[in-house]
Structures are given as C-alpha cells and as structure tokens.
C-alpha cells in the first residue's frame, strides 16, 4: 500500500513548486536538457565519420597539431643538417685546413682550392711569344732563326719530310700534296689527248721472215693426192663428192674428207650410220648353255 502513496506526494510537490516558483521551473528543464543531451551525445560520436578536431576538445587539438608539425619540421631540419655535415669533407676540406702548393720550391698554402688555382697560374703562365725572342732551328748545319713558332714549324718540314707522296699514273711524277697533283692532272690530260709523237725509225723496220722451202710440205712428202689441211672455201673434187651428205650431222664437207685417200671407200660418217642401224635391228647374241636358256634344253 505504500507504493501508490509515493506518486501522489511527488505530484503535490511538483504542483507546489510550479505555483510558488514558476521561473525556476522553466529554467530547470532548460538546464537539464543540455545535460541529458550531452550525456547522450558523449559516447555516440564516431571517430571515422567526423575528425576529432570539430568535437568539444577542438581548441586543445588545434594547438597540438602545430606542435606536431613543428616537431616534424625540426626533425627534418636536423636530418638535413646531418647529411650536409657528412658531405662537407668530400667536397671541400674542413675549415681551418691549409692547402699547400704542389709546385717545387713553393712553400705557400691557401685556405681554398680557388685561391690555389689562381696561385698556380703564376707558376704556369700561358705560352706567348716574347718581343724580340727568336726561335732557332735545331737541325744540324742550319743557322736560321724565326720570330714565331709557326714559322719554325713550317721550316722544320724542309728538314724532316714525311715519307708520303702522290704519284701521277700517266707520267709517273710524284707530288707532295694532292692539290699539286690535281693541278698537274689538268696539264697531263691535255698532253694525253694530243696525238702521240711518231715512233723512232729504227722500230719501223722489222727483220725479214725467212721463207720456207717447198720440200717442207708433209703432204707432198707422203705422196698423197690431197693436202692434209685445206681452206673451207674449196669444194671437194673427185669420186668423194657423192659420199658427202651433210644432212645427218650438219657438218661442212671439208671436215668429212678422209685422211688417207689411197683406197677408195665410204667415209667415216656413212660407216657410223651403217653401224648404228645394224646395231638397232640385230639383237645381242646370248651365250649357249647360259642361265637364260630354256629349261627343256638342259634336261
């Protein structure tokens, strides 16, 4: 029975408070509402949906970010500084070290390489022809002198000639340069186009050729009616004319003439034709009692 009495007392207190202090009652819900909303919203924010910078702890985090950036820049600066410190000895010597001059008899030293390079120019000045200086030839038995080195070099070529020349193929002349050879070729070609001079009279006369005696002919010594060698223009004569038939082989009549004409007979061409026809018609002879004989004859 105690439970129903409690709500009635609560309702009475709320009514009295509402009648006595209306301003406080209106203010209390406003103050409680943000508390409830804050209590509900605090565990709900999603860190992935919205960055934490825009939550209630914004100003603190904004101050923290620049601090982290400054730390990162500081770390990078220190890293660059360490790299530069490591590369300094490779490119230039450390400060305070003097670089001595490498020329013999010079005890000077310089703090930088640039100063040393400028100092070395005093030891090795550029080559220049001094006023009044003469260059003498070093060849034996030559006392000439020249005001410049270029003239001395040009003069030295007279004493030491290179073993090189350009030879003309027409007149077999030799030249030191190809330009002089080209100039000579114009003159040499003009002379080559002109008619050659007549040869000396001693070369015109030739020794007489001794004539052969008439007995040296082999055909006359053998007593043959026809010579061994005759020109192709001569036509065959005698009884050999009907035997010369150039149709089978297409040869000229002088080539088919027999070598010895003492005994008349058919020429070699007709004999060859007769043997060829005889061999085509007759069959080859078989040996008797051979393997090709019929089986009845061997019984």
Curated annotation (Swiss-Prot):
A zinc finger (C2H2-type) spans 99-123, 135-159, 166-190. InterPro entries: ZN414, Znf-C2H2_ribbon, Znf_C2H2_type. Disulfide bonds: none annotated. The keyword Glycosyltransferase does not apply. Residues 203-215 have a biased composition (Basic and acidic residues). GO terms for molecular function: DNA binding; zinc ion binding. Its main location: nucleus. Pfam families: zf-C2H2_8 (PF15909). Residues 217-228 have a biased composition (Low complexity). It is found in: Nucleus. The keyword Ligase does not apply. Residues 1-98, 193-228, 254-299 are annotated as: Disordered. Keywords: DNA-binding, Metal-binding, Nucleus, Repeat, Transcription, Transcription regulation, Zinc, Zinc-finger. GO terms for cellular component: nucleus. PROSITE patterns: ZINC_FINGER_C2H2_1, ZINC_FINGER_C2H2_2. Residues 1-20, 69-81 have a biased composition (Polar residues). PANTHER family: ZINC FINGER PROTEIN 414 (PTHR21695:SF0). Belongs to the krueppel C2H2-type zinc-finger protein family. May be involved in transcriptional regulation. This is Zinc finger protein 414. The gene is Znf414.
